[in-house]
Structure formats: C-alpha cells, structure tokens
Amino acid sequence: PVFLFAQEAAQKGVDEVINEKFGNATGWFVELIFAQIPVTDEVGIPWVVIMLLGFATFFTIYFKFINISGFSTALNVVRGKYDDLDHPEAGVLKGDLTPGADIPETIRVEGEEGEVSHFQALTAALSGTVGLGNIAGVAIAITIGGPGATLWMIIAGLLGMTSKFAECTLGVKYRDVGEDGTVFGGPMYYLKKGLSERGAAGLGKVLAILFAIFCIGGSFGGGNMFQSNQAAIIFNSTAGFTGGASGLIFGIVMAICVGFVIIGGLKRIAAVTEKVVPFMVGIYLLAALVVIGMNFTEIIPAFGKIWNGAFAPMGVAGGFVGVLVQGFRRAAFSNEAGVGSAAIAHSAVKTKYPASEGIVSLLEPFIDTVVVCTITALVIVITGNYLDAGAASGVQLTSDAFASAIPWFPYVLTGAVILFAFSTMISWSYYGLQSWLFLFGRSEKNVMTYKIVFCLFTVLGASISLGAVTDFSDAMIFAMAIPN
C-alpha cells in the first residue's frame, strides 16, 4: 500500500492523491449530512439547514420573540449595567429578574464562578463565527441567488438569535466548575445532565459523545485547516508569493501565533478576542462603508434590488424559492446558530443567572449575519461585480468589489481575512479542547496533546490544497447540530 501510494503521488501529486483517497472514504458522510430535500424541480435545500431554521422558528415563537424584546437588555448586560446582580454579596434576589432566571439551588452552587466577562464570552464566540463565511459565503449567495438572497439571510439571522439564546442559557446552567475555577461547559454537558434529569441518561450520554466527536473533527477541519488554507491563499496572492514553500512558511508562522494564544487557555483567548474582534470587525466595516460612501447614489437602488430580488428574482435558478434557499443556507453556515459551538464559549462567563448569558448571545447572530453579512452584500451589489458572468466567486469576488472603489483596498481585505481566520482558529481550538477533555479526561497531558495536534493541523492546512477534506470538516460542524 505504501509503495502504491508513493507511485500515485509521483504521478498525480500528494495533494491530489490525499484528496481523492479521503473523498472516497468520507464521501458517504458528507452526502448524508448535506443531503438535499428537493423544493422545486431545480432547487433543493440541505435537510440540516431545514432542521436549524425549523427549530429557530419554533424557539422564536416559544420564547415570544425574545430576539426583539430582549435586544436592548442584551446591550445593557454586555456594557455591565447589571454586573451588581452577579456580585457574590448581592445574594439571591426575589422575582424573575431575567426571562427564565436560574433556580436558587443552581445559583448557590455556582455563585459567581466563571472565567470571563459577558463581553469576553461574546467576543470569543463571535470570533468563531465572524470569519470567511461573512466574506466568501455572502459573495457565493449573491452570485447564485442574486441580491435578493440578502433579505433572506437577514431573516434567517434574526431567527437564529433565539437558537443561540436557548443553547447558551443551557450551556451556563449545566456547566461544570473545577476546583481551580476552570469551567467545562457546552452541549456535551447539558445533553448528558439535562437528559439524565429527565430519565434519559443513556441517550444523553450517547448524544454528548457524538457531539464531542463531531466538534473535534470540526475544530481540526473547518475551524482550523480551512481557515489557515484560505488565509494563506489570499496572503500569498496579494503579496505575490507563488509556489515553493510559501504556504508552508505561512502555516508555520500562523501556527506559532495560534499556539502562543491557546497555550494560555480561555482567559488568554478571551483577552485576545476582546481586542481583536472589535478591531477586525471595525476595520472591515469601515472599509466597506468607504466603498458604499463612494457610491452613495447607488445605495437606494441597491436596497431596491435586494427587496425586489427577494420576491421577484430575474434569471435565478428556481426563482423565488432559489433565492430564499441561498439566503437561508448562507446564514446558517455563517452564524452557526443551533450548532452548539457558541454554548461552549458562553458557558465560561462569570454569572449567577444562565439566562443573562443567553440574552447576551442574542447579539452574536445579529452582528454576524444582520450587520457584517448585510454590509458585505451591499458592497457587492452596489459595485455590480456579481453581474459579470466571468467574475470570480467567493472571497475573490468580494476583493474585486473592494478594488473597484480603491485599488489598494484588497490589502485591507487581506488583513481582515487573516484576522478573521486567526480569531476563528483560536476560538475553535477551545471548542475542540473542551470536547477532547470530555472524551479523554481532564489532564494536562491531554490538554497539551490536543493543542500540539491543533497547531500541526494549522501548518498542514496552509500547505496543501483542500477539497474533500474541507467538505468533510464542514459536514462535521453541521453534524454537531443533530445531537444538539
């Protein structure tokens, strides 16, 4: 087998052989997770996206549109208005202070234990979702579904806010706190503990293990290799580096940067993300607003194209349904609402009241999808690059849209992409680590083993061309939604 592999590699190249072998072995899993349910003769939608949107709609109605009614409260919690309620000397106050306030027994057990503030938990979770999906994914949606896909992305983002509220509230409610104050939380724990309370301990344990396995796979793939790969491609393209060891060198540098942050644990990750996330989102939005401002006469027509295209699209496969599918699909892939990953980061917050962190998590899909994705869409629609039949797709289309306004703007976008990739990687390293420790035990040896392996995958991702590996890792991330 080794000789045959070497022979094939010599003929086709190592990347191509790995891609082919891996695709043959995992294709069935990818097809299962992303199997499409036909909506019309021309258009289908992955069943996992239907599931995510279905539960998001259910939670939105069940919690009486808390995504809207709780929005101002979320802003107040993040800026620290209610921090005195979490103070250890505040005691247990009477009444339902937040929607779904915690039970006194849990409050007494938890106290104010936790590792990070509300704002740090939000930025840590945001850094895992605000990434290439906001830049490349939006471009893909508009290329296929036209400007109208933007409206359906926004609606899906608003619905996803309630899914985040539910999973992040549970993440805090059922977390474990170690003797040294380290927090262990996420779907692994609320599936195991919550279902055990309801007489389904066996089912809860199985679902928790499945989630942990999928999460580890997603952390190495979509949360790591894909990010380093795309960051390396756009950096080398912008810098003019081609061939040779450019990808390997970029991967090593990125791995060193990632390793430096993740070795310090969640507190260092949160300390980095609370500075990097506002900076990178701010830089990206500022650059986008400059492009929009330079074409301000096209703003109103652009909104007209988005509105009209959402209900009466022209030249889009599947018509109205085709546009709706593209918008919903890209929103689900971007904000990961219902996947469960964010609950791991939010579970480490310093609070007595689980629902207070659930309220904070409402902001995550709003910033990710409603704000960042919408601004990206406006840049693409206003500049009109998507109309060129021979135009690039994905991140390159967005880059071209920026370049059409100011030639050197792709350099700004390159910096934003690298920061997006970096922040996504450090957050997903934490998600994967929590799942790793859940499966293999909480020891320093297991912690270091995971972190070293994670950094090796960073180098690997930047060094090879990804195909089937990317498909599989994406499938692993969305497979997390099934047990969750």
Where on the chain are the PLM-derived regions?
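Extracellular loop-to-transmembrane helix junctions
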Residues: D41-G70, T143-T182, D368-I375, D474-P483
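Membrane-embedded translocation segments of transport machinery
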Residues: V258-E274, F279-S347, T351-K352, E364, ...
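Membrane-interface loop-to-helix entry segments
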Residues: L52, F59, F63-N76, L207, ...
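N-terminal alpha-helical transmembrane segments of multi-pass membrane transport
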Residues: P1-G128, T143-A149, G160
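Flexible loop linkers connecting adjacent transmembrane helices
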Residues: I66-H118, I140-I142, G146-T150, T162-G202, ...
